[in-house]
Structure formats: structure tokens, C-alpha cells
From Swiss-Prot:
Pfam families documented for this protein: Ribosomal_L1
Domain of life: Bacteria
Gene Ontology CC annotations of this record: cytosolic large ribosomal subunit
Keyword Repeat set for record: no
HAMAP family given in the database record: Ribosomal_uL1_B (MF_01318_B)
Record protein name field: Large ribosomal subunit protein uL1
GO function terms (MF aspect): rRNA binding; structural constituent of ribosome; tRNA binding
Keywords assigned: Repressor, Ribonucleoprotein, Ribosomal protein, RNA-binding, rRNA-binding, Translation regulation, tRNA-binding
Family statement: Belongs to the universal ribosomal protein uL1 family.
């Protein structure tokens, strides 16, 4: 268990768990409490007003964070011919078909994102039991099964993040690192919230953005006033 520092204890005592803080203040508090020796990630949890048990209310998608995530993503692409060349030119780290499938089956997966051209799904489809549990299975809903593999690669490299609501109706994501300027973190969160709003199911009733909280890897969490996000 991580040791709580005196600084974190002092900050925790000042933070009201029931108060909604303006986004700028919330991020400032979280960054101040992020005292680990590494560059902690700044994370967000968004509770949505949906019933995650209903298939027509599953919120899923992808968004390119304008200021990146602070992490360089390694991208693998299943493609052949001209599409393979386009993927390589766009900066894909690994491109292949049957040879790439063999790597996956052998447990050799040195990548964070998998993209596939539509005609490659005959190969990728056999890898579902391996890629699926790792969150790597390409899906057209998040833009990772697409004829435009070059754009998909560029988006992944530029800081695209995928999101999917969990069984409790919460979306978890990372909006950057402690080393990011506050305005960049605010911009990234605003982009994620905008994407979530656009992905709102037609059958969702009542308040959609119920709770938003930001936190760091090892630090405390702070609730955010959603009315201050759009203006950030």
C-alpha cells in the first residue's frame, strides 16, 4: 500500500468530498497532491446517467485529446498491399497479416493499439480470444477497423483514447500527466466530455453527466463542477 505523505494528508483535510470544485481548482489540487517520484497520470472518472445493462445504452467511442496523453503509443496494423504501405508511411510500428497474427498467438504483442483494414478481419477475427480480454480487438465503433488506416494510425499516435462505460455506468480515462500545464489538462478533459456528450444514447433520460472526478495515480480524487468544464 502506498504511503500517504504529510502533504497529502494536509490536502485531503482541506478537500470536501461532497463539494463540486471548478475544474481549474480541482486539477490544481490533484496536481499538488501528486507527490510520487514519477510523472503520475491524471485520471478522470465520469458517472453517466445510463443503464449499462441495456445494450442500447452502452456508451463507447474514441477521441483524440488535443494535447496528447504523455505516452507514446505503439501501433500494430493488420493490412496488406497498398494499405500496408499507407500504414507504414503514417508511422505504424508493426504492419502485417498472417505473420502478425502468428506473433499475437505466440504472446508476442509489443504494441498498445491494434488497427485493421476491413479485408484483414478474416485474420483478426481468429484472434478475438487473445486481443479481446486485453482491450486490443479492433472495432469499427472506435475507428480501429477502417479503410483509412493511415488516419487511424496518426490519430493513435496523436493521443487518441478509447472509452467505454463499465457495468456501473462509469467511464474511466487518462487526460495527461502531472507535468502537463493545467490548461492542457483542462482542454483534454473538455474534449473527452464533449465526445461523451456526443455519444449519449437516445434512450438515456434525466441527467446524463452525473458525476465527474479527477485524480492522480497515487493521490486523492476531487469532484468537478461539470458546469465549469465547457468553459475551460
Amino acid at each position: 500500500m502506498a504511503k500517504i505523505t504529510k502533504k497529502q494528508k494536509a490536502l485531503a483535510g482541506k478537500v470536501d468530498s461532497n463539494k463540486l470544485y471548478p475544474l481549474a481548482d480541482a486539477i490544481g489540487i490533484v496536481k499538488e497532491a501528486a507527490t510520487a517520484k514519477f510523472d503520475e497520470s491524471i485520471d478522470v472518472a465520469v458517472q453517466l446517467g445510463i443503464d449499462a445493462k441495456k445494450s442500447d445504452q452502452v456508451v463507447r467511442g474514441a477521441v483524440v485529446l488535443p494535447n496528447g496523453t504523455g505516452k507514446t503509443k505503439r501501433v500494430a496494423v493488420f493490412a496488406q498491399g497498398a494499405k500496408a504501405e499507407e500504414a507504414k508511411a503514417a508511422g505504424a510500428d508493426i504492419v502485417g497479416m498472417d505473420d502478425l497474427a502468428a506473433m499475437v498467438k505466440a504472446g508476442d504483442m509489443p504494441f498498445d493499439v491494434v488497427i485493421a483494414a476491413p479485408d484483414a478481419m478474416r485474420v483478426v477475427g481468429t484472434l478475438g480470444q487473445i486481443l479481446g480480454p486485453r482491450g486490443l480487438m479492433p472495432n469499427p465503433k472506435v475507428g480501429t477497423v477502417t479503410p483509412d488506416v493511415a488516419t487511424a494510425v496518426k490519430n493513435a499516435k496523436a493521443g487518441q483514447v478509447q472509452f467505454r462505460v463499465d457495468k456501473a455506468g462509469i467511464v474511466h480515462g487518462t487526460i495527461g500527466r502531472r507535468s502537463f500545464d493545467n490548461d492542457k489538462l483542462q482542454g483534454n478533459l473538455a474534449a473527452l466530455i464533449d465526445a461523451l456528450v456526443k455519444a449519449k444514447p437516445a434512450t438515456s433520460k434525466g441527467v446524463y453527466l452525473r458525476k465527474v472526478a479527477v485524480s492522480s495515480t497515487m493521490g486523492l480524487g476531487v469532484r468537478v463542477d461539470t458546469q465549469t468544464i465547457a468553459a475551460s
